[in-house]
């Protein structure tokens, strides 16, 4: 949408300066193979569908009432699945909202917060929105996070693990180094993709009072369309997030989303089976692309980050699109020769590989 300078006179000065986040494309064209936004290729648990239908058909009358502002049933389900106390759980309308509350609750400090120069691009957006001071820490030449860079004075630390878009994960020992180096600052580990092979820092919660772990149901639980995210931390940090949330939106999660997410957490067998299917497919996709001459960074996510020495990444993305396949291309320094490719089903991945082999490379 184009807005004229004259029309912008109604805007707050701060809003005129904002550079908003640009989400991955959600194409309106049918029959495209969508490998650009890291959505799960498999549906949610059948129990999720049953739970949503139950709300619609068996409890329809309650839709006139506000949902539980605390989403108690959901917090209890998460706490049980993670083996923690319910007081250590915070929930929100997707992990993006949870992250926004984290920035407001913890990151308005005199010193800058630290995060990688190549990471989730919502972090600089939140920083600008809230007026957070920041310092971007360059990844090393192998696109890895060097935790020694996060021992300098700061106002907090936020790290995506596995990192996005690079897909590389830190070990728990490395995360502990960051926590121990910053005992008086909040360290946030954003684990949107952790269920695809990385180690979760949730196991460290009771040992570190400065740790917040953020997760989502969008990726590994196939609920991107319902927007449910959560944070896990000691109760004194959760209290800060609740204070922010109740100063912004007391009812962030609707009844359908609560019911669906609860059902997802209660079906651990299905969850683990689908995660393993993605992991197995990812490893085969990496092998197949390597044969075609791609260099693929080591992935612990449901996507891969790949480059080809003989082909321009931007042109590859365009040629794939012409063949009905969408991948994510970032025209940014250091990564403008990489493609981020969501792991699909084996059939979808095979179509990608065959298209590259027969029609593009």
From Swiss-Prot:
Species whose genome carries this gene: Acinetobacter baumannii (strain ATCC 17978 / DSM 105126 / CIP 53.77 / LMG 1025 / NCDC KC755 / 5377)
Transferase among keywords: yes
E.C. designation(s): 2.6.1.9
CDD domains assigned to the protein according to its UniProt record, in alphabetical order: AAT_like
Enzyme class of the recorded protein, top EC level: transferase
This protein's pathway: Amino-acid biosynthesis; L-histidine biosynthesis; L-histidine from 5-phospho-alpha-D-ribose 1-diphosphate: step 7/9
Membership in a protein family: Belongs to the class-II pyridoxal-phosphate-dependent aminotransferase family. Histidinol-phosphate aminotransferase subfamily.
Gene: hisC
Quaternary structure annotation from Swiss-Prot or TrEMBL: Homodimer.
Keywords: Amino-acid biosynthesis, Aminotransferase, Histidine biosynthesis, Pyridoxal phosphate, Transferase
Name this polypeptide is given: Histidinol-phosphate aminotransferase
């Amino acid at each position: 949408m184009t807005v004229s300078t004259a029309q912008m006179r109604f805007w707050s000065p701060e809003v005129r300066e904002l550079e908003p986040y640009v989400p991955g494309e959600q194409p309106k064209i049918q029959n495209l193979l969508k490998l650009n936004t890291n959505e799960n290729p498999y549906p949610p648990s059948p129990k999720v569908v049953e739970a949503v239908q139950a709300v619609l058909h068996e409890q329809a009358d309650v839709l006139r009432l506000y949902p539980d502002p605390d989403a108690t049933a959901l917090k209890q389900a998460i706490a049980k699945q993670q083996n923690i106390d319910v007081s250590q759980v915070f929930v929100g309308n997707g992990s993006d909202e949870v992250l926004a509350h984290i920035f407001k609750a913890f990151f308005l400090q005199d010193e800058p917060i630290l995060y990688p120069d190549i990471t989730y691009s919502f972090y600089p957006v939140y920083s600008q929105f809230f007026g957070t001071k920041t310092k971007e820490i360059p990844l090393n030449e192998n696109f890895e996070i060097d935790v020694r860079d996060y021992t300098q004075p700061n106002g907090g630390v936020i790290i995506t693990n596995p990192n996005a878009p690079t897909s590389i994960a830190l070990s728990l020992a490395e995360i502990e180094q960051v926590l121990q180096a910053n005992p008086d600052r909040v360290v946030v580990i954003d684990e949107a993709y952790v269920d695809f092979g990385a180690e979760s820092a949730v196991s460290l919660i009771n040992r570190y009072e400065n740790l917040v772990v953020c997760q989502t149901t969008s990726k590994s639980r196939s609920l991107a369309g319902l927007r449910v995210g959560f944070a896990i931390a000691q109760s004194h940090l959760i209290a800060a997030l609740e204070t922010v949330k109740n100063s912004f939106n007391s009812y962030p999660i609707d009844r359908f989303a609560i019911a669906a997410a609860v059902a997802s957490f209660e079906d651990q067998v299905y969850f683990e089976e689908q995660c393993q299917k993605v992991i197995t497919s990812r490893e085969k996709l990496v092998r197949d692309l390597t044969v075609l001459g791609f260099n693929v960074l080591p992935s612990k996510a449901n996507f891969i980050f790949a480059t080809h020495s003989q082909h321009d990444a931007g042109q590859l993305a365009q040629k794939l699109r012409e063949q009905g396949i969408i991948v994510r291309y970032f025209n940014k320094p250091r990564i403008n020769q990489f493609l981020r490719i969501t792991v699909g089903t084996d059939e979808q991945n095979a179509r990608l590989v065959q298209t590259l082999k027969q029609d593009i490379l």
